[in-house]
């Protein structure tokens, strides 16, 4: 989350008149993240999160907001969009589509234990199962087509070795594309900073604005790449086992998913290496912005390329 579009207290106070949330008492920009403008909002009725959407349009946004509303009703601890007095989940503020959602308790974790990985695996599986009955459809905006376009854009900035790695992995992933894996709604960005923990467990899952329809296993791989890395690209086998075992307890993997796992881990690493390269070399102007290091995911991709045998058995 970042601040690209400034909002003053006066502007927000006027905007909030169309909501039954009481009077504004505090407004603070959130600097983490890279996609949207976000603020902590405090009113006389409690805390909320305000988001101004910098890329997504008013045509695209109903999928995400309705999905969060649906998952919240299904017991998934995610932000619940607040309706305006006109019963709309989406408004306009300072020329940008905007929404305000419930504030969830907890904090993101930096020191990860197996127990937390297990909790994340369980909640991800429950979200996948709940999403099977959601009628909305959204093609992955960061899928293969985007990978190829983004790769062409960032390629001139890369060293020869990085160019070779990127090109070879793209060609590999093109050959791996298949539709025989279980599909459904995926979060597509369930990193450590998007899961909030309280003293009793997970308090919330946030940032659903990359959610889409894709292979459920791909979502598990994206999650594993961040939650199970030791920080230098190396995967922690114990954490990986805890994550996958807890996931499978809620949604057992199919026979088709087992052999696809190594390629999915590589796909998840490639996708975020590309997006971080793009944001690093082609940043957007912002009042408060947060760049993320592309090397983090390049190292993870290289690890999966050279250490496929260390992947834990999903059947264990």
Swiss-Prot record:
The pathway this protein participates in, as annotated, is: Amino-acid biosynthesis; L-threonine biosynthesis; L-threonine from L-aspartate: step 4/5
Q: Which reaction does it catalyse?
A: L-homoserine + ATP = O-phospho-L-homoserine + ADP + H(+)
Cited SUPFAM superfamilies: Protein kinase-like (PK-like)
GO molecular function terms attached to this record: ATP binding; homoserine kinase activity
Give the superkingdom in one word: Bacteria
| E.C. designation(s) | 2.7.1.39
Q: Which UniProt keywords apply?
A: Amino-acid biosynthesis, ATP-binding, Kinase, Nucleotide-binding, Threonine biosynthesis, Transferase
Output the InterPro entries linked to this UniProt entry.
Aminoglycoside_PTrfase, Homoserine_kinase_II, Kinase-like_dom_sf, Pseudomonas-type_ThrB
CDD domains, per database record:
HomoserineK_II
Pfam families according to UniProt: APH
Task: Please provide the Gene Ontology terms (biological process) for this protein.
Answer: threonine biosynthetic process
Task: Family membership, please give it.
Answer: Belongs to the pseudomonas-type ThrB family.
* Name of the molecule in the record: Homoserine kinase
**Species of origin:** Nitrosomonas eutropha (strain DSM 101675 / C91 / Nm57)
